[in-house]
From Swiss-Prot:
Annotated protein name in UniProt: NKG2-C type II integral membrane protein
UniProt keyword Cytoplasm present: no
Membrane topology qualifier: Single-pass type II membrane protein
TM stretches of this protein: 71-93
Location in or out of the cell: Cell membrane
Native source organism of the sequence: Pan troglodytes (Chimpanzee)
UniProt xrefs under InterPro entries: C-type_lectin-like, C-type_lectin-like/link_sf, CTDL_fold, NKG2/CD94_NK_receptors, NKR-like_CTLD
Renumbered residue ranges of the record's region Disordered: 1-32
Gene behind the chain: KLRC2
């Protein structure tokens, strides 16, 4: 009977070898790196429809780097953002530089609105005056002042006329008439109220400011011109 029990015990141990290889409770089992890779391959074979998002999660869980395709897409995205920012900066910057490098005429207009006369102009009362040195016909003088964003010299009152007469002995003013039978008018089409020493000569249809007053002259004569514009305060 004792022999049978001994034989039975040996057979039981032989059939259940795990009991002979029990590990202490304090040690934890771990899966090697090779086993993890095998697990991943088996997972991919079993689930071929896994998308990139699922694969990324697996990589993140294991502390591995993302696939190179994802890194390439991120780099291309950053490059696109930088290029777009550069293009937008250029679009905004170019008009700004063109505005700063605008023509002197634009500078003259700004000076008028800022309440200051441009350089080489003089200020009297509430107006700016350009004292020209070139001799031109009446029509040429009118065009020259227009190019300076101003008008050919005009006279508002007697005091201004006396002041201007001291600056130049003779200069065109923005007053004319169609013929000796027509009244004197300004370039704005308004009737001119100041007296002009007239002549019966049919060709003297433009007005000139002299030291002694206003006088009619031939419009084709070459005379010094002055320009004027109002200050906007």
């Amino acid at each position: 009977m004792d022999k049978q029990r001994g034989t039975f015990s040996e057979v039981s141990l032989a059939q259940d070898p795990k009991r002979q290889q029990r590990k202490p409770k304090g040690n934890k089992s771990s899966i090697s790196g090779t086993e993890q890779e095998i697990f991943q391959v088996e997972l991919n074979l079993q689930n071929p429809s896994l998308n990139h998002q699922g694969i990324d999660k697996i990589y993140n869980c294991q502390g591995l780097l993302p696939p190179p395709e994802k890194l390439t897409a991120e780099v291309l995205g950053i490059i696109c953002v930088v290029l777009m920012a550069t293009v937008l900066k250029t679009i905004v910057l170019i008009p700004f530089l063109e505005q700063n490098n605008s023509s002197p005429n634009t500078g003259t207009q700004k000076a008028r609105h800022c309440g200051h006369c441009p350089e080489e102009w003089i200020t009297y009362s509430n107006s700016c005056y350009y004292i020209g040195k070139e001799r031109r016909t009446w029509e040429e003088s009118l065009l020259a002042c227009t190019s300076k964003n101003s008008g050919l010299l005009s006279i508002d009152n007697e005091e201004e006329m006396k002041f201007l007469a001291t600056i130049s002995p003779s200069s065109w003013i923005g007053v004319f008439r169609n013929s000796s039978h027509h009244p004197w008018v300004t370039i704005n089409g308004l009737a001119f109220k100041h007296e002009i020493i007239d002549s019966d000569h049919a060709e003297l249809n433009c007005a000139v400011l002299q030291v002694k007053g206003l006088k009619s002259a031939q419009c084709g004569s070459s005379i010094i011109y002055h320009c004027k514009h109002k200050l906007y305060r």
